[in-house]
């Protein structure tokens, strides 16, 4: 990045992305949360496709389409929540949803769904797109052309936004067993398929990308089981070790390019070696 003409742009977007993430987790109503959710999607698209060449532009367009599709269902869920509960503040929505008995008929058929189930399913689809849950996972494995610090932020923070959203709205999701069953099924399916795909990759970044999808699947499973506190613990643990692994992988790739004819001298990178070893143990669930 030292010789990159877009170095200043990269650092500015990086700082704005972190700021948007911090503001998003501090929101107490849907309006502000959706605004920073959108900013996060925008910065994510710009950062993860930092270099303008053919494959990057193609994957950037795919990312834009998938994230926008999820955002449409998210805003639809917000609109229905406002129609049902008359407010967008989380605390008031939780209180009013617990006593609401609204029933919707789907397409005029005999199939009926409660208002809280409809709202939570639509919001969950938005979380699926952000956290790369199957079948909305296609954008993540193809967006691996950016500098490694971007991937450390992306996989350790931004992709966790979907899991955070479900945990933040835990009182609302807990009111719908139907939605929790759907979340559990999608999370289980994602965890199994993503970890299986991870095992057959021969590119280290794609391997870590699919591992992130699998970890997000585990987090969704925990939310589907009602273990929202465990999901938050998983979010923090995953963010710490995935950021460390990505940064150390980036250092390894960089040094392999500088010294292609000989292995990197390990004595100069003791800290990276030890931190990678600890992160690998955590990743393997050897340490709680």
Question: PLM features: residue spans?
Answer:
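...captures the hydrophobic TM-helix bundle architecture rather than a specific catalytic motif
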Residues: 1-288
């Amino acid at each position: 990045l030292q010789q990159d003409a877009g170095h200043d742009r990269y650092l500015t977007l990086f700082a704005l992305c972190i700021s948007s993430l911090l503001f998003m987790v501090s929101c107490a109503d849907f309006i502000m949360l959706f605004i920073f959710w959108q900013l996060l999607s925008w910065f994510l698209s710009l950062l993860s496709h930092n270099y303008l060449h053919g494959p990057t532009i193609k994957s950037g367009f795919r990312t834009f389409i998938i994230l926008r599709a999820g955002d449409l269902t998210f805003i639809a869920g917000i609109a229905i929540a406002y129609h049902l509960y008359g407010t967008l503040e989380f605390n008031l929505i939780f209180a009013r949803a617990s006593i609401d008995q609204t029933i919707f008929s789907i397409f005029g058929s005999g199939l009926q769904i409660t208002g809280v189930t409809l709202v939570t399913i639509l919001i969950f689809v938005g979380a699926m797109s952000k956290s790369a849950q199957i079948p909305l996972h296609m954008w993540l494995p193809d967006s691996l052309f950016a500098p490694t610090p971007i991937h450390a932020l992306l996989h350790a923070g931004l992709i966790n936004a979907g899991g955070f959203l479900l945990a933040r709205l835990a009182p609302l999701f807990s009111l719908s067993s139907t939605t929790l069953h759907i979340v559990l099924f999608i999370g289980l399916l994602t965890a199994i398929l993503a970890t299986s795909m991870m095992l057959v990759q021969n590119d280290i970044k794609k391997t870590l990308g699919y591992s992130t999808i699998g970890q997000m699947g585990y987090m969704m499973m925990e939310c589907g089981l009602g273990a929202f506190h465990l999901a938050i613990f998983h979010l923090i643990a995953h963010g710490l070790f995935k950021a460390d692994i990505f940064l150390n992988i980036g250092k390894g790739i960089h040094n392999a390019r500088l010294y292609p004819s000989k292995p990197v001298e390990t004595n100069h990178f003791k800290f990276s070696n030890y931190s990678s070893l600890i992160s690998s143990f955590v990743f393997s669930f050897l340490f709680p």
